[in-house]
Amino acid sequence: MKVLHFYKTFGPEQFGGVEMFIRHLTHATSDLGCENTVLSLADEPLPPQQTPSVRMFQARQNFNVASTGFSWSVFADFARLAQEADVIHYHFPWPFMDLVHLAKGLNKPSVVTYHSDIVRQKVLLQVYRPLMHAFLGRVDAIAATSPNYLQSSSVLRRYRHKAQSIPIGLDQSLYPVADAEQVEQLRDRYGGRFFLFVGVQRYYKGLHFLLKAMQSAPWPLLIVGVGPMEQELMRMAERLQLSNVHFLGRVDEQEKINLMQACYSVVFPSHLRSEAFGIGLLEGAMLGKPLICCEIGTGTSFINQHASTGIVVPPMDADALHRAMKTLWDDPALAQRYGEAARARYLDVFTAQGLGQAYSALYREVVSRPSA
């Protein structure tokens, strides 16, 4: 089975949520006999690359508007690669992708992973909506990343007849193994126990509520990652005199796993539906950490089951975040039970092996349908 993935960004050094999803999915499906190709855009395209699980092609991005990359050359690249493929796998949202599909889709069997609604660009959404529905109406199957998102998305409501939920899964073997000595050094450096946030510092991550929750808190918080909100959040922490909040900036995968292993709990305060899933939260579950997140009707509270794997609180509620952190901090036995349950839930629901099997079955199903 030859599969062409199409998304706006993908490369060896990119670790955004969708890119990580594609990386873990292609690794899993290649073990099941799929030949995966990924086509994406880049300001400075790399030459084609081949790894054991995927071929990578990049077309030159000519310009970018509202997080949407455009490329004139990708039409020809897409048509050529689509001709070779048995099925095309799109990753939504990316409005330019819809245009390419409608122009060059070649009536190939097609699958869309619906990663997120378009939340912030409401004016542009009004212009884009007809193209979006033309695209979603033409594809053969749609997969949401959690049943929560499938049920709560007003866009997906129109496509229930061809939509299903396939949860994101992670392959732990693709991560480095935590360095035990460095893990102990981290615990010593930050007082033995600390809360951890890992992610890009974007507007929907709820980090300003987390900083408010840290006022008068006795426990340390480490914030890992960079992003457009970073400087504003650092100024806020300074203004609130939060000496127990530490911004670590960008870290590599080894450092991230060391921090995850060392931490007491993973806290994930995203407060808007732009946070469709939460890879950082799932990584915490994979490593057996108790979880804290907000109920926003998306995959965050599908990963984190309230009073089982951790605590789920209302969004935009700093007091509720503080109380959740205090509950775990004051009760190590409860935190340990939640962490063990989070690890068990990862193994039961969120492995890359399960992800690969589900998508391989979906590919076979759409390819076997009679042509329209």
List each language-model region with its residue ranges.
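Short His-centered aromatic/hydrophobic patch
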Residues: 90-97
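Acidic donor-binding loop of glycosyltransferase active sites
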Residues: 86, 195, 261-276, 289
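A conserved mid-protein helix/loop that constitutes part of the nucleotide-sugar donor-binding site
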Residues: 20, 193-216, 228-234, 319, ...
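Nucleotide-activated donor-binding/catalytic signature segment of Leloir-type glycosyltransferases, i.e.
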Residues: 234-254
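Short hydrophobic beta-strand element within catalytic cores of glycosyltransferases
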Residues: 286-294
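Donor nucleotide-sugar binding/catalytic pocket of nucleotide-sugar-dependent glycosyltransferases
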Residues: 40, 132-181, 192, 247
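Conserved acidic donor-binding segment of nucleotide-sugar-dependent glycosyltransferases
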Residues: 305-318, 325-332
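N-terminal strand-loop element at the rim of the active site
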Residues: 6-16, 20-69
